[in-house]
Amino acid sequence: MMKKISIALAFALAAGPLSAADLGGAALKVGSDTTSPPMEFIDTATGQIAGFDVDVVNAICAKINCTAEFVTTGWDGIFAALDQGSFDMVASGVSITEERQKVMDFTEPYIINGQAILVRAADQGLTLDDFRTNGKKLSAQANTTDAELATSIVGDGNVLAYDTFNASVLALKNGDVDGVVINGANGPAYDKEFAGELVVGIKDLQSDPLGLVFRKGDPNVAAFNEGLAEIKADGTMDALIAKYWAVQ
């Protein structure tokens, strides 16, 4: 039997009724910051955008009769680009927060993400208390719930936030910070990518529900919620979670 990696990944809400939505073959553009494996990334073998979020959106589109074209967009401008109509939706591991819900619409959660802290391999014994009480510094990508969590742990004065995740990793490697707050869903990929140098040392922190994002008032939200309920009900979502996070 397959066992899911313990990074607080779980179904978000019970499955609802089967979809009756039909978007009539609509071609939707989807903004995504493709630097966050396995959620979304550039497949080096094909040059194509791939990942869990891509598969989820495509699976929903198969249920509600639409197609998705993914567009790489930097996180720092992704919501402004959505608002300006550069694309129709965002699928980029976006946490659902009250502040964001004031200015954009979300689907129901499609997965729950438990945040984690990436540290240097030599420091993998660090605990959360070490960060809270010993003047340790944290980094995270700016304008994310990761950055908010970092501030809550070590205080604003001990957080270095960068526009890109790669800049945060460089700060960790250079010794400018002692850890980087990340989406726990990305942890296994980072353990593999940075093996021997960096490691996910602290896991299962704050749990964030993730949702697909639309402009305020977009009627497609209802259709995507129906499609999401259907892929939860028919086992598709289980299969996708197993594809990216389960181990034998």
Language model segments and positions:
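Short helix-initiation/N-cap motifs at beta->coil->alpha
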Residues: 54-55, 69-80, 125-126, 142, ...
